[in-house]
């Protein structure tokens, strides 16, 4: 299978995991939430939780590839999306080898004027559980 084909499978796996956890924790959400891109075109954010006004984007990368180069665009997409809150989830083993990418995204998030968080996939379940607890309180 091509590198691109593997990337699509791994990206779909991450999205399925996010969907499973959102469902298990009783979040009501939309998949492939439509908005207008920075270029004025139709675009989709992976998930949107209306109760939290939270847009979620998943990026998975297992090894060398171009996903990391898309992170600046993803951060701009959060600014363009109408949600006040954003969550960027890094899945795959690649991100731990390049911590500067997460640090850059977090720095950009702080400058954005929105509440955007950047987490690794392994922290997702705990993050969602804490968010669910805060929502219930």
Over which residues does each language-model region extend?
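Acidic-basic catalytic patches of nuclease active cores, encompassing PD-(D/E)XK
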Residues: 1-36
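Domain-level recognition of nuclease-like catalytic cores that cleave nucleotide substrates
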Residues: 9, 91-137
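A generic structural signal for alpha->beta connector loops
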Residues: 26, 83, 113-115
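Residues at the starts of beta-strands that form the adenosine-phosphate
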Residues: 28, 52, 85-86
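Alpha-helical scaffolding within the catalytic cores
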Residues: 40-43, 73
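Active-site beta-strand-loop-beta-strand hairpin of nuclease catalytic cores
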Residues: 43-56
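Hydrophobic/aromatic beta-strand patches that form the interior of the parallel beta-sheet core
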Residues: 56, 87, 117-119
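Catalytic cores of nucleic-acid endonucleases
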Residues: 60-109
């Amino acid at each position: 299978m091509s590198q691109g084909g593997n990337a699509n499978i791994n990206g779909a796996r991450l999205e399925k995991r996010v969907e499973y956890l959102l469902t298990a924790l009783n979040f009501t959400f939309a998949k492939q939430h439509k908005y207008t891109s920075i270029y004025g075109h139709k675009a989709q954010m992976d998930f949107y939780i209306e109760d939290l006004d939270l847009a979620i984007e998943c990026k998975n990368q297992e090894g060398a590839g171009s996903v990391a180069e898309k992170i600046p665009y993803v951060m701009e997409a959060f600014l363009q999306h109408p949600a006040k809150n954003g969550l960027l989830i890094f899945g795959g083993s690649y991100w731990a080898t390049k911590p500067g990418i997460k640090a850059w995204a977090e720095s950009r998030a702080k400058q954005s004027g929105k509440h955007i968080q950047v987490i690794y996939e392994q922290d997702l379940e705990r993050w969602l559980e804490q968010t669910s607890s805060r929502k219930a309180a």
